[in-house]
Amino acid sequence: ERLVGSEMCIRDRALGLCGCDGQMILAQKLDSEVDLGFVGDIKKVTTKPIVDALNNGYVPIISTVGVGEDGQSYNINADTAAARIASCLRAEKLILMTDIVGLLEDKDDDSTLIPQVNVSDVPYLKKKGIISGGMIPKIDCCVEAVRRGVKKTTIIDLSLIHISEPTR
């Protein structure tokens, strides 16, 4: 399956949505050892605005700012929001984009790409240090999405997506 994304292709169908619009992403302050300011965690996702956009032929582009019950805005990790939204929509597939090839057995060798990981493999791969650094939250989001019903997740290198003018 090939992901083709081009601003030129979706410009007329893109619809910007913000998670705080109509409390689409209801959030709360992230509970952490260090105060991270206005960083939030998702309490609830209301999918109606997304479903309405999709049903009307639009491609929703969602800013991952959530809102607390008190009206405070919170920044939500984009991968976390994508995983939660995908599961709430009962999506078949979640695609996360990154700036690296993917999960590598040797982080310095792109030829060691691990093409598939099962949820049950994740603890071992973390313990072995293969899942580390910035890949930890991406893999955790994929695991969470699968546990919440998304059938398949993919982490793709954004540089592999060819963006060009559409054929006219």
Regions found by a protein language model. Name each.
Residues 1-5, 10, 161-167:
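Single conserved hydrophobic/aromatic residue that forms the stacking wall/gate
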Residues 6, 11-16, 23-24:
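N-terminal glycine-rich phosphate/adenylate-binding segment common to multiple enzyme folds
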Residues 20-59, 63-155, 160, 164, ...:
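Active-site phosphate/oxyanion-binding loops
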